[in-house]
Amino acid sequence: MISAPNCLEMMNNKGFLMSDDKRANSMRGRVLICAGSDSGGGAGVQADIKTVTALGAFAATAITAVTAQNTKGVFGVFDIPIAFIRQQITVVLEDIGADVIKTGMLHKAEVIMTVAEALEEQGNKISLVVDPVMVAKGGHSLLQTNAIDALKSELICKADVLTPNIPEAEVLTGTQITTVDDMRRAGELLLNMGPKAVLIKGGHLSEDILTDILLSQSGEKTYSSPRLETVHTHGTGCSLASAIAAGIAQGQKIDTATERARKYVFDAISTAPGLGEGHGPLNHAHPLVKE
């Protein structure tokens, strides 16, 4: 009998044993996710882990808060102690490491500062994707008002990619966004805050064609796709940002990672399982399930 721990082999998806080399090549890139837990599994770290894994990267986590929620809303939030958030980040970086840190729900200034301090200790050498989560799909606030300035001064200015939706961009810039041109102007204001790139998402505009704009110092790229008329969109922002983070961790350029991420999320929405009575989750596993 062959001992698996000794021969260091594992089964691939066709049932064949894989060598060390093949196993190493099957998963590339490490993403440390600093975000809140969604008990319903549609958003937060649950969506992040599923997304990163489905795209072939490795996901580690530092849980910032635990929420009681389902497709109908958020019913409770339990804050994780700051010292324990920091401990989660520290032990992961000391052992596993990370190519990218992706942030989600950082609900108060102290949490934002904790993540920023961890980045500084690493010499700001780890790429950073900031999803400025402010409000849950059901309307529950996930970011204290007094934390917005900390988000701008401590993380947005250090981000490789910032991924706000329209309401988040309005809060961050103090502007009103009702058109694609407004999106572009807000994106430029956000870019002036220091991130290398800003992906401003146009899903909240009432247009049949959904438009996202990626702005960076080297230029602008516009992405368009047909709007999918569905309520099963819970966790789209988390999933998109994590998909971008996975791509960057795997060595992709930001525009390439963004293009793959948008396709991944579009397909995840279009094949959503239809769970729950409210805003249902996506099908994060669609790249892995072949009929």
Language-model features, listed with the residues they occupy:
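Conserved N-terminal subdomain of the carbohydrate kinase-like
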Residues: 21-33, 53-138
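Short, small-residue alpha-helix embedded
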Residues: 51, 170-171, 230-254
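Phosphate-handling active-site elements
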Residues: 55-60, 221, 247-261
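Conserved phosphate/ATP/ADP-binding segment of small-molecule kinases
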Residues: 145-220
